[in-house]
């Protein structure tokens, strides 16, 4: 892995992206990650590119002692201060459907999931729009949300009986076609599928420019190209911020 990406011994990338020599490197580099440091990076990017989009791939309102005791409110408060433009979901649903609805209804940003369906009627859940448009840098961008597809298998279904999930490649294709028909010049899939599932989706669904991949905690220093789609794996636990600069010309992604 380190040879493939040209990662030097003892470098920050060696520490952040590899478990080899972790103990000795930890003594040199110390604590990594945390939303305070994420905020520092995000603020620096926004100062450089005020038109940047900030997207959150989920697993955000769960996983810590304070999160458990506040039903996710501590993380909701921090993320509201960070001001992302959109998010999608996985472990958030283990707060229970009512609590998720309570939080989502008060969010100042988009809560997206093209594959979150009403379990009784097998139609898209009204609380979670499939996509949202953004105008940035003179480009019309569509962000399509993709929540974790295997929710009732990986987590207790009684916590969210109102919803069904699944990969729903065909519906994703329909959403891509829909936003393209509405003038989207760039299509971003904000996904919690997992890296391998996202690569598979990229090979099946046409018209997606970028997949921001979550769930499997993979952290890669470069995007992976699948056909005409780049797949970006951004790690986990607040240790990484992935910055993707795109060259969009005449409604097409020409480079990154």
Range-by-range predicted roles:
Residues 1-256:
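Acidic, metal/ion-coordinating pockets
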């Amino acid at each position: 892995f380190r040879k493939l990406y040209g990662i030097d011994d003892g470098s920050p990338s060696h520490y952040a992206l590899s478990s080899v020599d972790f103990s000795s490197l930890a003594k040199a580099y110390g604590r990594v990650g945390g939303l305070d440091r994420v905020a520092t990076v995000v603020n620096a990017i926004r100062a450089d590119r005020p038109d940047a989009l900030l997207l959150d791939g989920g697993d955000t309102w769960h996983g810590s002692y304070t999160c458990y005791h506040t039903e996710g409110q501590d993380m909701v408060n921090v993320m509201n201060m960070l001001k992302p433009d959109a998010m999608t979901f996985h472990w958030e649903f283990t707060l229970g459907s009512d609590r998720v609805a309570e939080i989502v209804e008060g969010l100042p940003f988009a809560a997206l999931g093209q594959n979150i369906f009403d379990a009784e009627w097998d139609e898209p859940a009204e609380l979670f729009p499939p996509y949202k448009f953004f105008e940035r840098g003179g480009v019309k961008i569509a962000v399509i949300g993709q929540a974790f597809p295997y929710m009732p298998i990986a987590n207790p279904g009684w916590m969210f009986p109102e919803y069904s999930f699944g990969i729903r490649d065909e519906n994703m294709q329909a959403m891509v076609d829909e936003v393209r028909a509405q003038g989207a010049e760039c299509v971003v899939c904000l996904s919690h599928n997992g890296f391998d599932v996202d690569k598979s989706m990229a090979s099946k669904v046409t018209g997606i420019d970028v997949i921001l991949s979550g769930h499997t905690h993979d952290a890669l220093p470069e995007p992976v190209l699948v056909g005409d789609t780049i797949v970006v794996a951004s790690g986990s636990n607040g240790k990484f911020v992935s910055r993707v600069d795109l060259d969009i010309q005449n409604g097409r992604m020409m480079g990154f």
